[in-house]
């Protein structure tokens, strides 16, 4: 989070870097032009960011008590935090929070974004996958999984994000895989309450590794318009165009979230079916530039 008082510091260092590369003095017309341009851009950003801050439940990071930790799958946990200071039900389905943690493992404080699964007036629930491979260990996810316990305090930013339900007069279709289900749960819940046909396709490797099963089952049990379809890779293979086609007859608004390969596969299948991509929305937990639409 960058506040107005930070922009002069950024500008000073940016101009110093430009001078270092170009060899120009601070009074050179080129540097003066850069300084003026930066000032104008900074003013625009400050105004835009202030509008965002005005709609946030709180500014900066605030401490919250962790009241519940649930092992959703072998590598995904959900964390419930509690507050009587803010109305946490005001979060928008699809948004995320940022956690700020410290650990003896790290020489600095680390921050990461995690999508909100659900919430009410006094609680927020967010999901975290323990991100460990042979080549990489997620700094923050391993801290949350291995070092954080119920009763601990954790610093969170206010919910933000632009992944949200759109065109609510149309049927709604959600397609998720793995921890990519995290933002889709609350979106599915909201869509199910809108009295339009609402479907969720949850792609899993095995039936035993199905995150957020209880919440999803509760949504379908309480809303006649909501349907949940489980696609088990070990039994049915990858989710391909021929299977997707049966869910598209009513031209739903589509929301996709999952790993890079999953996103590529679903998006390519929709293109193969000549689906209108203006009604397709997706969220990645990686830089968006790595996923082409």
Residue ranges and their predicted role:
Residues 24, 106, 166-167:
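Surface-exposed helix-capping loop/turn segments at secondary-structure junctions
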Residues 45, 74, 291:
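Short, well-ordered, mixed-charge alpha-helical segments that flank or form enzyme active sites
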Residues 1-61:
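Globin-like tetrapyrrole-binding proteins
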Residues 10, 32, 39, 139-293:
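FNR/FR-type flavoprotein reductase catalytic core
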Residues 1-2, 7-11, 34-41, 45, ...:
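Long, contiguous hydrophobic alpha-helical segments, chiefly transmembrane helices and signal peptides
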Residues 2-18, 90-97, 102-118, 175, ...:
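Short, charged N-terminal helix-start/capping segments
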Residues 58-153, 204-206, 233:
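Ferredoxin-reductase
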């Amino acid at each position: 989070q960058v506040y107005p008082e930070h922009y002069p510091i950024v500008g000073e260092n940016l101009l110093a870097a430009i001078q270092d590369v170009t060899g120009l003095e601070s009074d050179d017309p080129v540097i003066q032009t850069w300084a003026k341009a930066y000032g104008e851009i900074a003013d625009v950003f400050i105004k835009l960011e202030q509008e965002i801050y005005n709609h946030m439940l709180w500014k900066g990071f605030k401490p919250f008590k962790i009241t519940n930790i649930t092992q959703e799958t072998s590598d995904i946990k959900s964390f419930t935090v509690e507050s009587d200071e803010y109305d946490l039900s005001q979060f928008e389905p699809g948004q995320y929070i940022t956690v700020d943690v410290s650990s003896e493992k790290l020489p600095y404080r680390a921050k990461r974004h995690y999508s909100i699964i659900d919430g009410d007036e006094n609680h927020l629930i967010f999901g975290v996958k323990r991100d460990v491979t042979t080549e990489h260990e997620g700094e923050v996810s391993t801290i949350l999984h291995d070092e954080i316990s119920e009763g601990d305090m954790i610093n969170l930013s206010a919910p933000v994000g632009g992944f949200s339900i759109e065109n609510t007069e149309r049927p709604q279709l959600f397609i998720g895989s793995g921890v990519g289900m995290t933002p889709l749960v609350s979106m599915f819940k909201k869509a199910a309450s809108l009295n339009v046909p609402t479907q969720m396709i949850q792609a899993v490797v095995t039936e035993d590794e199905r995150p957020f099963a209880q919440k999803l089952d509760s949504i379908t049990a309480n809303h006649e318009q909501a349907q949940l379809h489980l696609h088990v890779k070990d039994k049915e293979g990858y989710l391909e165009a021929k299977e997707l086609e049966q869910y598209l007859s009513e031209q739903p608004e589509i929301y996709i979230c999952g790993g890079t390969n999953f996103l590529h596969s679903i998006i390519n299948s929709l293109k193969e079916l000549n689906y209108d991509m203006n009604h397709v929305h997706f969220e990645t937990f990686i830089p968006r530039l790595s996923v082409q639409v």
